Amino acid sequence: MELPLDNVDLSKLSPNFLKFNERISGVAKKANYAIPVSLSTEVLALNGPVLHYILNSAKGGNETAVTQRTASTNQQNTLQNSLKINESDPITKELWEKIQKAAETNGKAKEQGKSKKQGTEKTTTLTLLKTESSQQSNTTKDGKATSDEAIKKTWGDYQKVENGLKGYTFKASVFENWHELLDFSARIARSFTNIHTKETKKGTDIQGVLGIDSTPNALFTSVFAAGGGNYDNFFYKVQDGRADFSNFKNKETSYQNLQKVFSDYKELIDKNGLFVNKGGSYSSNFQKFHQLAYSISSTSGFFYSFAGNSAKRLKFDDGNFIEFPRFTQPVKAPNKTTQSGGENNNKSENNLLGTFEIEDKSKKRESVESSEKSSSGTQSKSKKGKSMKTIYLYKAQIPEGKNKGDNAILITNQTVIDKLEKAAKEDGKSGTQVSTIASKSTTKENQENKIIGYTSTDNLREDNKNIFDIDDLNDEKYDRKIIVSATEEVLEQSNTLQSEEAVVLPAPAKYKASDSTKIAITQEPNLIGIHANEKENEETRKFVNWFLNSEQTWESKKYSKNKQNSNEKRTPAQFFADSASYILPLKKTFDNANKKEDQSKANNKTNSQRTNTYIEKALEIFKGISQNQITSYSDPSDFRSGRFRDGIGSNFNAVVNSKVDFNKFINNFIASLGSDI
């Protein structure tokens, strides 16, 4: 049974974030049954370098550089019917400047990478440039041009087509409502053959224009916005303690608005321009490699959304890839040192598939300058002085002297065995694509340390094609996987999206620009009490009150210099929310939102940390909700809510592949709901 959280002091919380308690079905009385302690919302992250290439190509910027030596009449023909940027609008002008700056940053990163390889080779080029005319000197590439050239390699040439960007006027407001955003996205898709002609996409292909991590969120908020931010016009509402789905079942406003929203999406889907998360494959996995122009995702995912200065990924033989997982070790082919693996008979010589190393936490850390193998060949020291332990992978049986789960794993999947053995036999194939000049001696050494696969305890989904489950080691808290038929790629910084190259905006707050109400989703877990007995109920309320209101002293490295511990006084709820990149909806947080944002930037600058622009945008959005400038949306709570959400999401995601019409989509959706709705 539910437990009303009476006698809990909620006065510090903004009341607008407690209103969802009014939309809980099946409760005996109106009360606060749930408390939001870890809020997030959604943002629209623009890939600045990609969007610059798209807009600059459509406005003729790249074509003009090619035709500057031609007659002025030809230039005018080139620019005729080109895209226009409405720079008379100050918001659009500011956005375009941010996009240009992002492309400049991306291009400079590529040029800096070149300079490291080329040294002083630019001297001759600069001398030649001085002899060119002043007109030609204007075509000297800056960072933006360099960035555009890099993006073009994957996005391909811009095509000037009808219903594309030809004659289109770009303005910042296209990102403020779903109708214009989807129309703009479809125009981009029509303008690039690498998008609209590719029905089947490999992991390294352009995935689309717009990426959406949660299609239920996108559909719910757009339909809610189209209904004026009123639950009476939504799919369902809670009335008299019960959930009422009649608006949807009777094909009233919510059904009709869903049909309009679907029609807008269908234009983009038909041109292969929409990427949706179908379970773990987030938009950021592709946007960070310039494979999307922009995406909508949760503000809690900032630290997963951008690449580092030296991004890596694992590319599979079929052309697909995954971002290089955390907690991953290379699996090396057997060599003279490891071949026996401590075995004492020749019958087991081909039993060993490979080895990998993990930190041996049972050994005391010592400081050493280089890796050294111990006399047994199973213990070594890393360059950081950590004691390392060799783990052996066997295919037939674990030999005497080795212990399953301790220093040995038995591989029973024949596909894994075949792929590891094949990789070990292949000549000249390395597990990492890097530029190296190797001598004969180093070539021999590299062969002895040949990478034939990878193993990881990161959160990976096995596909039984390239990623497989294997046995865990003793005391491991997470499932271990083995990755085969993969090559590690180290990417240039210019080929990835850095956080400073993204322009972060709120997710569309309206369905159409003419809508009177702005909408923003609020999501993530709430603190909920469960009824037990009077004594335990009271103790539960005391805990919740302590969690929300009792300040404690915490050790923190977050805002301290040199990552040294410092003491901070915060409530447990504040500590929890901050640690997980969520927001606790305190009144004072929104009253001091600008001050908090400035302090966050200053702290990040002092500690050379990336500014969490997602949290900054969330604070801005939540401040609007707190001050009644934005209407908060969250799913009304009912035992059928999850089925409704899952059903609309899975059936819409299926449309992205099948491209069926609205009638087929809605019939499949209704069929998935069952008789309860």
From Swiss-Prot:
This is Uncharacterized protein MPN_364. Residues 121-137, 340-353 have a biased composition (Low complexity). InterPro entries: Lipoprotein_10_C, Mycoplasma_lipoprotein_cen_dom, P68-like. Residues 104-120, 358-372 have a biased composition (Basic and acidic residues). Belongs to the MG185/MG260 family. Residues 104-147, 331-384 are annotated as: Disordered. Pfam families: Lipoprotein_10 (PF03202), Lipoprotein_X (PF03305). NCBIfam families: lipo_P68.
